[in-house]
UniProtKB/Swiss-Prot annotation:
UniProt organism field: Rhodopseudomonas palustris (strain TIE-1)
HAMAP family the UniProt entry points to: MurC
Gene Ontology terms: cellular component: cytoplasm
GO BP of this protein: cell division; cell wall organization; peptidoglycan biosynthetic process; regulation of cell shape
Family: Belongs to the MurCDEF family.
Catalyzed reactions per annotation: UDP-N-acetyl-alpha-D-muramate + L-alanine + ATP = UDP-N-acetyl-alpha-D-muramoyl-L-alanine + ADP + phosphate + H(+)
Keyword Cell division: yes
Name assigned to this protein: UDP-N-acetylmuramate--L-alanine ligase
Length: 467
């Protein structure tokens, strides 16, 4: 039995969240009655309102009046008044992943998981399938520039979704094709141990039906180990590793992007195939690897080499993934969501490959607990930055941890050999600090999952105001 068409209204608590908003938008486009609430106004809230969705700002019991079902994410606390009211009224309460799973049952699905690179890879798979006239439905964890939204309802048989592993609920998603980009120690507040994280990814792949397949990056040692443990499922490996079934070759930086080729090897059939002259308008090895995963899926689904080439060359990117926000006196300002040491290192390496000038990193650490648990990694991931400007920790709802703050991080970076580290007093001071450091040809890269994105977009104008 599938989600009945007559059910509704469907009420989303926290509808403005990037994961919740995409599901709400697709349900609305399918004809379901959708409503919701969020703690504050936002671009996502405004976009959904424009589609006719009623949204309350603030959470209170009266907001759920008339609802047939309540959808919540793990960010919603157990004492939320709307959640309490729904349970008191015996209204069914479902998790975000459960509702996403219901949508996935309507289509054949590609689900993209991994500690890093999910959003970009999801966008690339969507772009390639779209170019191949498969007209996919898409639910992503970031705004796809080509769509201006993180979700779209397609008319084809395929759906492409980002599978968020943070709370383990990605195991509920019925994927026909699974991508695993990498697996690092993250979300240990939920999983407790890294072994549990790895077990979850193994189960995610083994949940794929016998007629499906998984695409896994064996450049990552943990993923390579997982490949050896998974039985009775078809796996296509990818990466620069010579053992990869889809091997990334001849990667080179070119005009702010990358060029490369992908060589396929079918061990069972004993055949080989190569797609050459691939161009991606994004820099960085990490983005080329993400593209290789998407190419592997597209190739397996029968898209022509020429379609893949054209779609990749036209890829418009994802908001907050190496997004240029403006220029000032020849200085390029970049906004990026990177907030884990692995992501930060990859973004800064891409910036280094994109300019002969200096790379100036502006970082807003995200969560005290993450900075504490990965402190050594944070202190060693800025090697490609000539200067590091450190803002206060963005708490994301966490209470401060004694000794884990901006100044402690600054001292840690200096102790690890960074010679030019600046403690940022506040966002209003950023333009003045950057103006004193940057010259024509330099890149200023703003990094973090908090409100630093607003600083990145304001910075070009603030710098121009200084003269």
């Amino acid at each position: 039995m599938r989600l009945p068409r007559h059910i509704g209204p469907i009420h989303f608590v926290g509808i403005g969240g990037i994961g919740m908003s995409g599901i709400a938008e697709v349900l609305c486009n399918l004809g379901y009655t959708v409503q919701g609430s969020d703690a504050s106004e936002s671009a996502n809230v405004n976009r959904l309102r424009e589609k006719g969705i009623q949204i309350h700002v603030g959470h209170q019991a009266d907001n759920i009046k008339g609802a047939d079902v309540l959808v919540v994410s793990t960010a919603i606390k157990r004492d939320n008044p709307e959640l309490l009211a729904a349970r008191a009224q015996r209204i069914p309460v479902v998790r975000r992943a459960e509702m996403l799973a219901e949508l996935m049952r309507l289509k054949s699905c590609v689900a993209i998981a991994g500690t890093h690179g999910k959003t970009t890879t999801t966008s690339m798979v969507a772009a390639l399938l779209d170019a191949g006239d498969l007209d996919p439905t898409v639910i992503n964890g970031g705004i796809i520039n080509a769509y201006g939204t993180n979700a779209r309802l397609g008319g084809g048989d395929w759906m492409v979704v980002e599978a968020d592993e943070s709370d383990g609920t990605f195991l509920k998603l019925p994927a026909d094709v699974a991508i695993v980009t990498n697996v690092d120690p993250e979300h240990l507040d939920h999983f407790k141990t890294f072994d549990a994280v790895q077990d979850a990814f193994r189960n995610f792949v083994e949940n794929v039906p016998f007629y499906g397949f998984a695409v896994m990056c064996i450049d990552h040692p943990v993923v390579q180990t997982l490949v050896g443990k998974i039985e009775d499922r078809r796996i296509i490996t990818y990466g620069e590793n010579p053992q990869a079934d889809a091997r990334l070759l001849d990667l080179a930086a070119s005009g702010g992007g990358s060029t490369f080729k992908v060589a396929f090897r079918d061990r069972k059939a004993g055949t080989a195939h190569e797609i050459a002259d691939l161009k991606l308008p994004m820099p960085g090895r990490h983005n080329a690897l993400n593209a290789t995963a998407a190419i592997a899926v597209a190739h397996e689904l029968g898209l022509s080499d020429d379609t893949i080439r054209k779609a990749l060359a036209a890829f418009g990117g994802v908001r907050r993934r190496f997004t240029k926000t403006g220029e000032w006196n020849g200085v390029t300002i970049i906004d990026d969501y990177g907030h884990h040491p692995v992501e930060i290192a990859a973004v800064l390496k891409a910036a280094r490959q994109s300019t002969s000038g200096k790379v100036i990193a502006v970082v807003q650490p995200h969560r005290f607990s993450r900075l504490q648990s990965l402190f050594e990694e944070f202190c060693t991931c800025f090697n490609d930055a000539d200067a590091v400007i450190v803002a206060d920790v963005y708490p994301a709802g966490e209470a401060p941890i004694e000794g884990i703050d901006r100044d402690h991080f600054v001292l840690g970076l200096r102790a690890h050999g960074h010679r030019d580290v600046v403690a940022l007093q506040d966002s209003a001071s950023l333009a003045g600090v950057v103006a004193g450091l940057a010259h024509s040809g330099d890149y200023v890269v703003c990094l973090g999952a908090g409100n630093i994105t607003q600083w990145a977009y304001a910075l070009p104008g603030e710098l121009k105001a200084l003269g």
